[in-house]
């Protein structure tokens, strides 16, 4: 103790040391690395790279450990290194906490705090490496050495030989992503650096010995120098050395020499901030009672800090700072609880019924009451430590049980508790229960559970001695499995039980795991070939799937796992090994928005479906065992079986990003489980009676009587054939397995298929009838239809490059009538799915249809009308085609959905937040996701539309009109983007998703533009013209009109009017861009067919008329890229998307006068409706489309535009007036 104190004092003289100490007291005060914040308690300024959140915890932890050492009989002054003292136990606890902290850091700050995570791993690994390390720490010389280990010369007196040999193990710098604990890069460490040999009883070591370097003080960047990251070196912000006082003997002068590397630093990598460092008080006399200080709160959870404060009894500010450092980014790691020195508190076991921030019971009762009592009696700790010393590596199954990983087979006997669990629910309850938590705690203490440094990121427990296991992925999520909550202040949370996460999840999941959410976001699903079974099977290998949402329209899915750990493990696994369905690589990540899924209208009990799938899976396993015997276990990959090779139908690229590399064939990724899909036997078994699936007894029966499956499934085999044909027929989603995975379906898959077939057939008929009616309503429509077909044939790709694979064939398969039917069907479905906006949209759509019909009639009256009708026919047909395509895949997805849910997607889409998520779908921040988002075009919800919007914006910048379209698309049209990819190729390939859609629409508009400008002006044209005139007079700043149009639930008539204004605009523009800008109006013009489509789409669209417009835009997109783009902009611009639709490129709203209040706010110039005046005038009027329209009108029809604006309310008269003007100007 004296030595430590003296050394700490020595260190104190050094300026940096003292500041570090202060930093420890005042997190972030001393930490030169700003990131340290509270964590940077002892970080010397020289290395300012501490990963802010993670490192704070470590330094404090280190300080706490130092204090404990000082106070402990075996502290610095007591050279009892071989004897596990309470201090060593506490150090072990600190180590565990550090590990936990690192895990959390890894989880939350893998990107920003990679260094910190690495440091934590290293530090924890080092600490865990050996009890001797703790003993060394306790030993005065040891303590001294540690202080300077970070390359800071340590007090020579203290540990002259403790300097870390240059060859000492160096942990990757905090900046590195937690590499394996020992990096063996110690060479960087100055000889003075104290190397803590994992197994050395005393700090001094031969330089040649690889030793754990305590240079944790290094913050952040610490070169991969040494063992503990010389954290002090790296960022030295973490070093507690400056706070030599706080680090009594820990890194007295050495620490100060290091400037940042202090013994405290040892624990806290610079990345972590110096807070983790042990304060001198903790170890030195100053630490009176500070040894009680909480080990090292991993997070600056704030609460933890407060808790830690109480823990520090006579703790000096440094110690307080350490508890404060708990505030690091991970509340889970609480400073206080880390080292419960006193017996004051028995382990407080996690009460599964008691809410915890981490969904996991405190690790092994790690939760301490406010962590004040968090430290367990030193005696108890010592015992624990001793137990820890005898480390027995856990078996894989033991680790899984320890971490609460859902068992693959049930019933399951918990190897930790010897309790038999019969189902996942019971397992979940058991894992969260006190018994399991206690057993895990005891087990961890006795067995010294240590995670193998299998993952650079995370196994913290490098040393058998230290049980402090690095919970690889468990931070918060895995903690729940362990039944320990990291977030609470369980000082012990970090404890041996810390290895809450299965090692498998240790690496990649960290970045994903920012929360304890159980929802996994799956993007890039094959458009037509992904079934619920496929999605659910992705998660089954990792545990129970409690809920899911399959959004076929967006090619996205959300899986809710029973445990956060399972979700994280799943994400991590698939990050390492991409999941592939039908050759499409899936983007799987933790949902950033949803912690759990709540279906507004679960069509069928998800539990039942999932149970069926589980049963099926088990059954498959049994069956395989029977058929293949022991050799069956092909791949250990948890996903091997879960990956559903069932997607047989060709994947539709609309959902998958064009960028996603082709995935292995289903057979490949199926891991030879082709038998599932291709094996009639397997399929029959799968599709066997759903009821048997649900019962495990049935599984047994199946095993006993495998032929029963065949007998049962013979009819289903036929169904299988039907299904196979069906996907080919345009219902790829309805693969033979769409339902096979869901034994729920009371009706056999075949019956379901038959129903679907009947339904679709009926739908097409109804749609055909409706379409015919529309054509009848507008004589020119037939011609338009023909043109649309031609255009379809010409622009199949523009229509939807992404969909082309599946949609093109669909279009080919289905006649225009069928397309119309599908449009109607989609409309119906959408209406069902999107009940909220369905009524409004229907009304709007109806109005639009009527208006469109009227306009068409008007057009028939005039050549322009005829031209417009032609265009409309084209648009309508393409729109129908596109709608049909969309419906095809939607119906497919719905067909799948129907298997599980009612036919209406309405039930399917229904995470209360899913709409939001899809709207923002920031979750998949990947271009693929953007592309995926567009798939949701029909669905009002495009979680990833935001991404699409962003991409779209960029692409739009490339082209003004495309830009505008993209803006609209970005918001509301993102959904269309995927569909329009085909069109996009024709228009512009710059934007794979949104741009594509917009571009195609623009191109089509351009193509039609001549006709439209010449003849295609309908009544709506007048409105559009007025708008344009207004826009011209004002400015052409109306990107938002599209959004407004979408947003506003204006009647379809108005929309119909809008299209003509767009047509006028197109004419006025006379350029493809103009056409594109006005494409949406034109599309609207083609109101009878288009509007019908729009109605369907509107019904489909959750949004109101905007959605219908959006649908309409889609149709138009099919008809013409430019045209579609405009229209897409309008409908795509959803109210929620409006702000996003607006591009800040154009900062000044111009032509605001063109925005007139109607049902919503309608831009006469651009023919767009907006629900929000602000959006219309501020956002839309800044849009490139609006600007262009304004320019053209200002230059060509400024005067006329004003007049027309006055008469904009009367669509036909205005259209009549506007059309000539447009024609003139365009001509």
Curated annotation (Swiss-Prot):
Changing residue 1060 to A: In A10 mutant; does not affect nuclear localization. Changing residue 636 to H: In CMD1DD; also found in patients with left ventricular non-compaction. The modification Phosphoserine is found at residues 498, 635, 637, 640, 642, 660, 679, 742, 801, 865, 876, 891, 893, 977, 980, 1013, 1048, 1060, 1080, 1115, 1120, 1210. GO terms for biological process: heart formation; negative regulation of mRNA splicing, via spliceosome; positive regulation of RNA splicing; regulation of alternative mRNA splicing, via spliceosome; regulation of mRNA splicing, via spliceosome; regulation of RNA splicing; spliceosome-depend formation of circular RNA. A zinc finger (U1-type) spans 409-443. Changing residue 635 to A: In CMD1DD; causes the formation of anomalous isoforms in TTN (Titin); impaired localization to the nucleus, leading to mislocalization to the cytoplasm. Residues 628-655 are annotated as: RS. Changing residue 1060 to D: In D10 mutant; mimics phosphorylation; does not prevent nuclear localization but induces increased localization to cytoplasmic ribonucleoprotein granules. Phosphorylation regulates the subcellular localization. Phosphorylation of Ser-635 and Ser-637 in the RS (arginine/serine-rich) region promotes nuclear localization of the protein. In contrast, phosphorylation of the C-terminal disordered region promotes localization to cytoplasmic ribonucleoprotein granules. Residues 313-331, 741-752 have a biased composition (Polar residues). Changing residue 914 to A: In CMD1DD; impaired mRNA splicing of target mRNAs; does not affect nuclear localization. Residues 624-634, 674-709, 716-738, 753-772, 784-807, 816-856, 868-888, 1024-1036, 1201-1215 have a biased composition (Basic and acidic residues). A zinc finger (Matrin-type) spans 1161-1192. Changing residue 52 to T: In CMD1DD; uncertain significance. Residues 43-56 have a biased composition (Pro residues). Residues 1-58, 289-374, 624-906, 977-1089, 1201-1227 are annotated as: Disordered. Changing residue 679 to D: In D10 mutant; mimics phosphorylation; does not prevent nuclear localization but induces increased localization to cytoplasmic ribonucleoprotein granules. It is found in: Nucleus; Cytoplasm, Cytoplasmic ribonucleoprotein granule. Changing residue 194 to L: In CMD1DD; uncertain significance. RNA-binding protein that acts as a regulator of mRNA splicing of a subset of genes encoding key structural proteins involved in cardiac development, such as TTN (Titin), CACNA1C, CAMK2D or PDLIM5/ENH. Acts as a repressor of mRNA splicing: specifically binds the 5'UCUU-3' motif that is predominantly found within intronic sequences of pre-mRNAs, leading to the exclusion of specific exons in target transcripts. RBM20-mediated exon skipping is hormone-dependent and is essential for TTN isoform transition in both cardiac and skeletal muscles. This is RNA-binding protein 20. It comes from Homo sapiens (Human). The lineage of its organism: Eukaryota, Metazoa, Chordata, Craniata, Vertebrata.
């Amino acid at each position: 103790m004296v030595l430590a104190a003296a050394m700490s004092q020595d260190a104190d003289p050094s300026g940096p040391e003292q500041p570090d100490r202060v930093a420890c007291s005042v997190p972030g005060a001393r930490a030169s690395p700003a990131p340290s914040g509270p964590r940077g308690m002892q970080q010397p300024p020289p290395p300012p790279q501490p990963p802010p959140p993670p490192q704070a915890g470590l330094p404090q932890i280190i300080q706490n450990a130092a204090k404990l050492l000082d106070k402990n009989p075996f502290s610095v002054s007591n050279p009892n290194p071989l004897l596990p003292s309470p201090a060593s136990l506490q150090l072990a606890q600190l180590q565990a906490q550090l590990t936990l902290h690192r895990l959390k850091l890894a989880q939350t700050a893998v990107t920003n705090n990679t260094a910190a995570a690495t440091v934590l791993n290293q530090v924890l690994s080092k600490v865990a490496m050996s009890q001797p390390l703790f003993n060394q720490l306790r030993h005065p010389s040891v303590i001294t050495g540690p202080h300077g280990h970070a390359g800071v010369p340590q007090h020579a007196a203290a540990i002259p030989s403790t300097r870390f040999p240059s060859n000492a193990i160096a942990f990757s710098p905090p900046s590195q992503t937690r590499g394996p604990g020992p990096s063996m890069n110690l060479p960087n460490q100055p000889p003075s650096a104290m190397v803590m040999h994992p197994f050395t009883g005393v700090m001094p070591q031969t330089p040649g010995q690889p030793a754990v370097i305590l240079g944790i003080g290094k913050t952040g960047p610490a070169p991969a120098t040494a063992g503990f990251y010389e954290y002090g070196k790296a960022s030295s912000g973490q070093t507690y050395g400056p706070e030599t006082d706080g680090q009594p003997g820990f890194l007295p002068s050495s620490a100060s020499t290091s400037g940042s590397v202090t013994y405290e630093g040892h624990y806290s990598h610079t990345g972590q901030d110096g807070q983790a460092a042990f304060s001198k008080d903790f170890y030195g006399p100053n630490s009176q009672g500070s040894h009680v200080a909480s080990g090292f709160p991993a997070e600056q959870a704030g609460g933890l800090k407060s808790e830690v404060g109480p823990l520090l009894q006579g703790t000096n500010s440094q110690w307080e700072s350490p508890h404060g450092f708990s505030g690091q980014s991970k509340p889970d790691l609480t400073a206080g609880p880390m080292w419960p020195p006193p017996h004051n508190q028995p382990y407080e076991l996690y009460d599964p019924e008691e809410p915890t921030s981490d969904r996991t019971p405190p690790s092994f009762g790690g939760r301490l009451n406010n962590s004040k009592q968090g430290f367990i009696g030193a005696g108890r700790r010592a015992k624990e430590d001793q137990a820890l010393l005898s480390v027995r590596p856990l078996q894989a199954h033991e680790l899984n049980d320890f971490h609460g990983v859902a068992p693959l087979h049930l019933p399951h006997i918990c190897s930790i508790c010897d309790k038999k669990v019969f189902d996942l629910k019971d397992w979940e309850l058991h894992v969260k229960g006190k018994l399991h938590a206690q057993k895990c705690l005891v087990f961890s203490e006795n067995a010294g559970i240590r995670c193998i440094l299998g993952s650079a990121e995370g196994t913290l427990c490098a040393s058998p001695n230290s049980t402090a296991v690095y919970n690889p992925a468990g931070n918060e999520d895995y903690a729940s499995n362990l039944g320990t909550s990291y977030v609470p202040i369980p000082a012990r949370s970090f404890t041996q039980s810390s290895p809450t996460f299965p090692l498998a999840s240790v690496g990649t999941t960290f970045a994903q795991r920012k929360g304890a959410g159980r929802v996994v976001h799956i993007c890039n699903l094959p458009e037509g070939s992904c079934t619920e079974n496929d999605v659910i099977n992705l998660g089954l290998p990792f545990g129970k799937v409690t809920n899911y949402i399959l959004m076929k329209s967006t090619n996205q899915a959300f899986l809710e796992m029973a445990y956060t750990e399972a979700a994280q493990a799943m994400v991590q696994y698939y990050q390492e090994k991409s999941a592939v369905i039908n050759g499409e690589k899936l983007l799987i990540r933790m949902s950033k928005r949803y912690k759990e899924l709540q279906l507004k209208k679960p069509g069928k009990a998800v539990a039942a479906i999932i149970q069926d799938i589980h049963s099926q899976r088990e059954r498959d396993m049994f069956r395989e065992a029977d058929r293949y015997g022991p050799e069956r276990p092909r791949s250990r990959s948890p996903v091997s079986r879960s990956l559903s090779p069932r997607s047989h139908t060709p994947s539709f690229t609309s959902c998958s990003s064009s960028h996603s590399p082709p995935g292995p064939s289903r057979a490949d990724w199926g891991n030879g489980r082709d038998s599932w899909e291709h094996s009639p036997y397997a399929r029959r078994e799968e599709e066997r009676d759903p009821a048997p699936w649900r019962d495990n007894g049935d599984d047994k029966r199946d095993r006993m009587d495998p032929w029963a499956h065949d007998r049962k499934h013979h009819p289903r085999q036929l169904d299988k054939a039907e299904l196979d044909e069906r996907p080919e027929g345009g219902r790829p989603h309805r693969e033979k397995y769409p339902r096979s995975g869901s034994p729920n379906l009371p009706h056999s898959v075949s019956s379901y298929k038959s129903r679907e077939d009947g339904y679709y057939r009926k739908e097409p008929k109804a749609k055909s009838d409706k379409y015919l009616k529309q054509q009848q309503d507008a004589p020119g429509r037939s011609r338009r239809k023909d043109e649309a077909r031609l255009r379809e044939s010409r622009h199949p790709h523009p229509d939807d490059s992404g969909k082309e694979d599946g949609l093109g064939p669909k279009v080919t398969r289905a006649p225009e009538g069928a397309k119309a039917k599908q449009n109607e069907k989609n409309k119906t479905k959408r209406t069902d799915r999107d009940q909220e906006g369905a009524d409004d949209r229907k009304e709007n759509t109806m109005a639009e249809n009527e208006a469109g019909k009227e306009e068409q009639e008007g057009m028939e009256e005039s050549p322009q009308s005829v031209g417009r009708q032609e265009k409309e026919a084209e648009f309508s047909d393409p729109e129908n085609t596109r709608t049909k395509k969309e419906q095809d895949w939607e119906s497919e997805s719905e067909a799948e959905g129907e298997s599980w849910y009612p036919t209406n997607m309405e039930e399917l889409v229904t995470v209360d937040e899913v709409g939001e998520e899809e709207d923002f779908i920031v979750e998949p921040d990947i271009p693929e996701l953007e592309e995926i988002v567009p798939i949701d075009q029909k669905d009002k919800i495009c979680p990833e539309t935001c991404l699409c919007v962003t991409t779209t914006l960029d692409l739009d910048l490339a082209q003004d009109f495309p830009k505008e379209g993209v803006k609209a698309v970005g918001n509301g049209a993102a959904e269309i983007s995927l569909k329009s990819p085909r069109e996009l190729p024709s228009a512009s390939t710059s934007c794979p998703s949104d741009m594509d859609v917009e571009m195609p629409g623009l191109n089509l508009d351009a193509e039609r533009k001549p006709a439209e400008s010449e003849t295609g002006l309908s009544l709506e044209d007048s409105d559009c013209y007025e708008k344009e005139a207004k826009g011209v007079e004002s400015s052409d700043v109306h990107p938002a009109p599209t959004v407004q149009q979408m947003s506003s639930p204006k009647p379809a008539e108005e929309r119909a009017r809008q299209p003509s204004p767009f047509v006028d605009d197109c004419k006025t523009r006379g350029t493809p861009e103009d056409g594109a800008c006005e494409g949406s109006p034109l599309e609207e013009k083609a109101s009878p067919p288009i509007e019908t489509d729009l109605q369907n789409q509107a019904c489909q669209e959750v949004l109101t008329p905007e959605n219908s417009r959006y649908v309409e835009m889609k149709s138009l997109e099919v008809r013409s890229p430019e045209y579609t783009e405009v229209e897409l902009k309008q409908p795509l611009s959803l109210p929620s998307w409006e702000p996003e639709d607006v591009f800040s490129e154009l900062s000044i709203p111009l032509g605001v006068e063109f925005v007139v209040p109607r049902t919503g706010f309608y831009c006469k110039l651009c023919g767009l409706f907006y629900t929000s005046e602000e959006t219309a005038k501020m956002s839309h009027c800044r849009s490139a489309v609006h600007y262009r329209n304004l320019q053209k009108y200002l230059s060509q029809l400024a005067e006329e535009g004003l007049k027309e604006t006055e008469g904009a309310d009367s669509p036909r008269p205005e259209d009549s007036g506007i059309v000539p003007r447009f024609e003139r100007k365009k001509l």
